[in-house]
């Protein structure tokens, strides 16, 4: 009676599960082909009953144990590895292959394994046991492994092998080590570029930092930052380079300390700036190293294209001192212009008028003047540095006659006072010297002294001397034909009280043996 009741219940459960469950096309690939011969017969059913714990199965049927309700999901796909082609719940899931050695947890089905006949178990595994039965049973009871052994339940969250190895499903979990390995390579930076130590001295690097600051002064910490930013070598260099920077700031005269108002005695508020008197020297030093090895400097820089900017740029507070003194340059030029104007040089900025006159006078050479001359006749003539003196009157009129009485004492000191003006004269004026042989050639070419009067309106006017004076050589009545002009020899002065000039300057006559006399006018 008991066996017939159990058999009727099992047959009804198998038929209901067969009608209610519809396999998807994907599930048909995993199901083995089922033929008419595989359907259970009476003998197979009886043999299966002998391997089942009948009291336990009856208790499950009476208690309406719901193992496959849709609200309860299985803890893990690997937990049902011991079942063969068994569906849990109403929703279709991929079928599981039967494993001979798998052990199902006790808490899942609540059954203890009992050894059964392998042939009958394989026959029963051909049917899907999922789906909801009309009698209330949701799933077919667990089929057991053929060997009788003590169960070892697995934890709910564990699995025997990765699901991807069982199903090959695209949504299954995959090992995470390839992604972690790739992430490690992605996060790892490439090998940093090696920057050599710059060939610039520490003083040049400090000067670059100060020159490229907004105010021209920086604290020590910002100087460090500038060097590390533009020369990456200092990012990984030992800390000794910071001591070298501080020593250069303290000992090098190119840098000076700037005390801020808010700093007081605190060292943190101390700023460093360039010494404006030595800023040009520092720039020259930078350009020298740039010309020496430009490639090495570029290799040591983070941005080599900024080198020219770092060397040449200056803030407003680091402008050259010469730019502040530029108004002095026109004053110097004006003073030089005045000196040259007093030395018979026509300046284009001045109005075109005669500045002074060059007078070639026939002054007699008396024997009584020779004792009064301060230079002996046999002394050589100072042809290289002739005495010059500026004329107070710039009119081209006839010049006063030189007096024979005395020679002023300051006349001999003119040479030392006017050396600078002589050096500043235009060389074309100094080439005006006419040597004796040239004078003779001009005389032979019918060049008379009367033609010199044509220069009267020019800045260099020439007035021929008075007829009352005796010629230079011998007792001849003619005007001196032999004149050697070696420079501008004229010195005149007028009385301060406006009286007609008297005893201004006496002419000096220098004679050299074997050469023609030189007239100093």
UniProtKB/Swiss-Prot annotation:
PANTHER family reported in the protein's UniProt record: FORKHEAD BOX PROTEIN N1, FORKHEAD BOX PROTEIN N4
Annotated source species: Mus musculus
SMART domains, per database record: FH
Tissue specificity comment: Mainly expressed in proliferator progenitor cells in brain and retina rather than differentiated cells. In contrast, is expressed only in postmitotic epithelial cells rather than in proliferative progenitors in the proximal airway.
GO molecular function annotation: chromatin binding; cis-regulatory region sequence-specific DNA binding; DNA-binding transcription factor activity, RNA polymerase II-specific
Record function comment: Transcription factor essential for neural and some non-neural tissues development, such as retina and lung respectively. Binds to an 11-bp consensus sequence containing the invariant tetranucleotide 5'-ACGC-3'. During development of the central nervous system, is required to specify the amacrine and horizontal cell fates from multipotent retinal progenitors while suppressing the alternative photoreceptor cell fates through activating DLL4-NOTCH signaling.
Compartments it resides in: Nucleus
One annotated GO biological process: neuron fate commitment
Record region (Disordered): 371-406
Keyword Kinase: no
Keywords linked to the UniProt accession: Developmental protein, DNA-binding, Neurogenesis, Nucleus, Transcription, Transcription regulation
Name of the protein in question: Forkhead box protein N4
Gene3D superfamilies: Winged helix-like DNA-binding domain superfamily/Winged helix DNA-binding domain (1.10.10.10)
Keyword Hydrolase: no
Residues in the DNA-binding region annotation: 197-293
Primary location recorded for the protein, binned into one broad class: nucleus
Entry GO terms, CC: nucleus
Disruption outcome: Animals display early postnatal lethality, while survivors exhibit noticeable body size reduction starting at P8. At P8 and P20, retinas are reduced in thickness with the inner nuclear layer, inner plexiform layer and ganglion cell layer much thinner than in wild type and lack horizontal cells as well as amacrine cells. In lungs, mutants show dilated alveoli with thin walls.
